Curated annotation (Swiss-Prot):
Keywords: Ribonucleoprotein, Ribosomal protein. This is Large ribosomal subunit protein bL28. The lineage of its organism: Bacteria, Pseudomonadati, Pseudomonadota, Gammaproteobacteria, Vibrionales. One of its GO terms (molecular function) is structural constituent of ribosome. HAMAP family: Ribosomal_bL28 (MF_00373). It comes from Vibrio parahaemolyticus serotype O3:K6 (strain RIMD 2210633). The gene is rpmB.
């Protein structure tokens, strides 16, 4: 499973580790992904999403039904 948020689309980005001597080595910055089950009242079932902490805040703000409609409009299966 790829490390991509289903709500925000955030994915890993690359950058550098920097030592005290300022030597650069490549590294990846990973999103804060969590797997979370949400109860969808309109469908009378749980939906499991893989999303970032920011994605959870978006669901708190907009509601699970609106966010699921956006995800399905993008063609993702949920």
């Amino acid at each position: 499973m790829s490390r991509v948020c289903q709500v925000t689309g955030k994915r890993p980005v690359t950058g550098n580790n920097r030592s005290h001597a300022r030597n650069a080595t490549k590294r990846r910055f990973l999103p804060n992904l969590q797997t979370h089950r949400f109860w969808v009242e309109s469908e009378k079932r749980f939906v499991k999403l893989r999303l970032t902490a920011k994605g959870m805040r978006i669901i708190d703000k907009k509601g699970i039904d609106t966010v699921l409609a956006d995800i399905r409009a993008r063609g993702e299966n949920v």
